[in-house]
Amino acid sequence: MSILFYVIFLAYLRGIQGNNMDQRSLPEDSLNSLIIKLIQADILKNKLSKQMVDVKENYQSTLPKAEAPREPERGGPAKSAFQPVIAMDTELLRQQRRYNSPRVLLSDSTPLEPPPLYLMEDYVGSPVVANRTSRRKRYAEHKSHRGEYSVCDSESLWVTDKSSAIDIRGHQVTVLGEIKTGNSPVKQYFYETRCKEARPVKNGCRGIDDKHWNSQCKTSQTYVRALTSENNKLVGWRWIRIDTSCVCALSRKIGRT
């Protein structure tokens, strides 16, 4: 249909040019070559379109059923909050690198040191590293001599028995303790930081003016990716809350300005 339209249009155009232009009209050979090029372009376009349709049909016919996209369940978790694990032995390590957090560790042995770039001075470690503990104490004493003190005292440790947590939607989920991958299972460890005590000094946080402020040390949480399950199914990576810092919470005393 498009080829016939090109021929009719060019014949009409040629008739107009023949009436209005004498010496400046297009030569016969150039007009014929233009018609041929347009016809060839139209044929090539139709051929490519047909090939694309054939390729798409062949791909859909060979696509495995397991790879067919499924409609999300109504009321299910958002994609950003939940990433399923299809095969524990093939996808686990790849997704762990993708969602990696220094506070979450998959290992076949209990870690003995804090994650890289984290301070050693508040780390509650294993007796195996007793010499490092004494070194940290000497370092802390050296800081005290310089007059440097923390508003709140915190401690950090690897949690080895975490069984449940609250995810980003506020739902209770089960934290996978042991994951079977290949020959040796691995466990999931969480590096958490919390306050040693709510009031390091008599009136609250250290260094706060207690005449005008009420103060208290509180453990703060943040979200990390972890392998969890919900209702003993839907195993995957979710955002869960863990303890990550100790902060001083202030409130102004009544009647003070």
Curated annotation (Swiss-Prot):
SMART domains: NGF
Pfam families: NGF (PF00243), NTF3_N (PF19338)
Keyword Membrane (UniProt): no
GO molecular function (one): nerve growth factor receptor binding
Basic and acidic residues composition bias: residue spans: 67-76
GO cellular component: axon; dendrite; extracellular region; extracellular space; synaptic vesicle
Domain of life (superkingdom): Eukaryota
Signal peptide interval: 1-18
Keyword Iron-sulfur: no
Primary residence: secreted
InterPro entries for the chain: Cystine-knot_cytokine (IPR029034), Nerve_growth_factor-like (IPR020408), Nerve_growth_factor-rel (IPR002072), Nerve_growth_factor_CS (IPR019846), Neurotrophin-3 (IPR015578), NTF3_N (IPR045815)
Subcellular location(s) per record: Secreted
Annotated tissue distribution: Brain and peripheral tissues.
Pro-piece positions: 19-138
Disordered: annotated segments: 61-81
GO biological process: cell surface receptor protein tyrosine kinase signaling pathway; cell-cell signaling; induction of positive chemotaxis; modulation of chemical synaptic transmission; negative regulation of neuron apoptotic process; nerve development; nerve growth factor signaling pathway; nervous system development
Keywords per UniProt: Cleavage on pair of basic residues, Disulfide bond, Glycoprotein, Growth factor, Secreted, Signal
Disulfide bonds: C152-C217, C195-C246, C205-C248
Glycan attachment points: N131
Family: Belongs to the NGF-beta family.
Protein name according to UniProt: Neurotrophin-3
